[in-house]
C-alpha cells in the first residue's frame, strides 16, 4: 500500500490509495467523498481540506456548542501545519527533506534525523522483517512508473534489474543513540510512501486532541481515523466496491477511537501487453 509523499502536480496531480475507497458518511445519509468540501449548516461541525502527501486530506471536527466553531477552525489549521511539517521531513520529492538527505549521503556518512523520522524508519524495518522482505523502504531508486491518465509509463526490465541492485532494507542502519540513519551502499534511496502516511495523519489527530477537540475525523486518501462521535452518532465510513466504484460494499460505524485503511489498483493503473500494472 503505497502513497506518494508530496507528488509534484506535473507527475499526476492528486494521487490516492484505493482498493476500496474509504469515504466518510457525514450526517444521517450524506455521502461525502474525499476531496469534497461541504459548507456545514451546523456551526458545531467544521470541515476543511488540504492537499498533502499527493492526496486530499479532509478534517472534520465537532463540538457541542456553536460558540466553539472558531476554536475548531484554529485547531484544524494547527493540525494541517503539523502534517505539512512532517511531510516535508519525509518526502522523497523534496531535495531538502531528511529522506532525500539520507539518499544523497548513501555510502558516505550517517545523517542526523528527527525523532519523528527515526520512528517511521524503525517501523519500516519492522514491516520489512514481518513481511519477510516483501515491504522494503529502500525502493527509492525504482521511480520509472507513472499511472496517471495520459502519463502512463513503466521502466524497462533492464532498468528494474539495475534498480533492484540498490534495494535492500538490511543496508539501512539506524543509530538511536546518535540519532542518525545511514544507507551503506552508494546510490541507494528511501521511499517511505508505504509507511509514512498513517503516522502523519495520527500526528494531525493528536494536535486536535491537544487542542481540546473531542470529536474528529481525519481522512487521507483512503486512510480514515476517528475520535469520539459525530453529534452523538458513530462516524460512518463507507467502503466502495472496486468492481463497481459507484456502489458501496458496506458501511463501518466507528466510535471512540478507530482506523480504517484501504488501498487498491482499480483507479491508478493501466494495461500494457495484456498485463495490468498498478501503484501497489
Protein language model regions, located:
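Mature catalytic core of soluble alpha/beta enzymes
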Residues: 2-280
Amino acid at each position: 500500500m503505497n502513497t506518494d509523499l508530496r507528488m509534484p502536480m506535473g507527475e499526476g496531480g492528486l494521487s490516492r490509495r484505493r482498493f476500496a475507497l474509504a469515504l466518510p458518511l457525514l450526517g444521517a445519509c450524506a455521502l461525502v467523498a474525499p476531496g469534497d468540501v461541504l459548507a456545514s449548516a451546523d456551526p458545531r461541525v467544521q470541515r476543511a481540506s488540504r492537499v498533502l502527501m499527493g492526496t486530499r486530506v479532509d478534517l472534520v471536527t465537532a463540538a457541542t456548542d456553536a460558540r466553539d466553531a472558531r476554536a475548531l477552525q484554529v485547531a484544524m489549521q494547527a493540525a494541517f501545519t503539523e502534517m505539512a511539517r512532517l511531510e516535508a521531513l519525509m518526502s522523497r520529492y523534496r531535495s531538502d527533506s531528511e529522506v532525500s538527505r539520507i539518499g544523497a549521503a548513501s555510502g558516505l556518512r550517517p545523517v542526523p534525523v528527527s525523532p519523528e523520522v527515526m520512528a517511521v524508519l524503525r517501523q519500516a524495518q519492522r514491516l520489512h522483517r514481518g513481511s519477510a522482505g516483501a515491504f522494503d523502504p529502500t525502493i527509492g531508486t525504482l521511480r520509472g512508473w507513472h499511472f496517471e491518465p495520459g502519463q502512463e509509463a513503466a521502466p524497462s526490465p533492464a532498468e528494474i534489474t539495475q534498480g533492484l541492485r540498490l534495494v535492500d532494507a538490511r543496508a539501512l542502519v539506524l543509530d538511536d543513540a546518535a540519532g542518525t540513519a545511514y544507507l551503506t551502499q552508494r546510490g541507494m534511496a528511501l521511499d517511505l510512501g508505504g509507511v509514512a502516511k498513517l503516522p502523519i495523519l495520527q500526528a494531525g489527530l493528536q494536535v486536535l486532541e491537544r487542542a481540546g477537540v473531542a470529536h474528529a475525523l481525519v481522512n487521507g486518501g483512503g486512510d480514515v481515523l476517528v475520535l469520539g462521535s459525530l453529534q452523538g452518532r458513530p462516524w460512518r465510513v463507507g467502503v466502495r466496491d472496486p468492481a463497481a466504484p459507484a456502489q458501496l460494499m458496506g458501511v463501518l460505524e466507528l466510535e471512540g477511537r478507530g482506523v480504517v485503511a484501504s488501498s487498491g489498483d482499480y483507479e491508478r493503473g493501466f494495461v500494457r501487453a495484456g498485463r495490468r500494472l498498478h501503484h501497489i
